[in-house]
Amino acid sequence: MTTLDDKLLGEKLQYYYSSSEDEDSDHEDKDRGRCAPASSSVPAEAELAGEGISVNTGPKGVINDWRRFKQLETEQREEQCREMERLIKKLSMTCRSHLDEEEEQQKQKDLQEKISGKMTLKEFAIMNEDQDDEEFLQQYRKQRMEEMRQQLHKGPQFKQVFEISSGEGFLDMIDKEQKSIVIMVHIYEDGIPGTEAMNGCMICLAAEYPAVKFCKVKSSVIGASSQFTRNALPALLIYKGGELIGNFVRVTDQLGDDFFAVDLEAFLQEFGLLPEKEVLVLTSVRNSATCHSEDSDLEID
């Protein structure tokens, strides 16, 4: 049992606070206050650290890490796109250069095919009016000249003046020759002005135009009248395919009594009665004056 003293002492002890207890409580409050700012500063430091090198493993640190990752990923994607664009541009330039080369080769191939197709020089100029390739033009001209030379060589080559000795021979000369051959017949009689000049010109032109058949016949052989002999000689008749395509009487009225092969050539070309010459093989007929001077002393029957 408790005594009255114990109760009194106990109550005193229960409700009694000593000064030492107050001091202890003050110390505890100070310690508590001193520790509180330290604990509150920790999250701030952690947050700042999270914004720097992401050492914080909290929610904010994870978010910052994710944002940084997405930023790096975007930059890498943009760099890849730029690299791809550079590669595409490089490839396109390479492809364009190759296409240009193929296009140029195709143009040259087409040009060669057109040349092989034997088209005329006018058609060639029209099809290639935007191209100024002198090398191919020269090649085309050379090929055309070669073709003309071969065409002339396909037919007979005469290169001389044939003397017709009878009326029947005169008719056979006209009717039995190939239809593509041009025949020039000089009707003459000795002593008539211009006869020797015409005979000399015929010899020179026969050498210049081997595909043309040059002939001569006396008017008396073919039974011409004396009036024709006096008024029409020297006469030049041109036949092709059995048809008379040119008839020139008293040629001296146009050329004079003394003329040269170049004069007769120009006269016939004016009427389109001479074919194209072999430019690559034959010399110009304008040098025929020498030929005429050499043959002027020859006696032609």
UniProtKB/Swiss-Prot annotation:
Question: N-acetylthreonine (modified residue): where?
Answer: 2
Q: Where in the cell is it found?
A: Cell projection, Cilium
Cross-referenced SUPFAM superfamilies: Thioredoxin-like
Name the major location: other
What family name appears in the similarity comment? Belongs to the phosducin family.
Protein's job: Acts as a positive regulator of hedgehog signaling and regulates ciliary function.
Assembly state and interactors? Answer: Forms a complex with the beta and gamma subunits of the GTP-binding protein, transducin. Interacts with the CCT chaperonin complex.
Protein name stated in the entry: Phosducin-like protein
Give the source species.
Answer: Homo sapiens
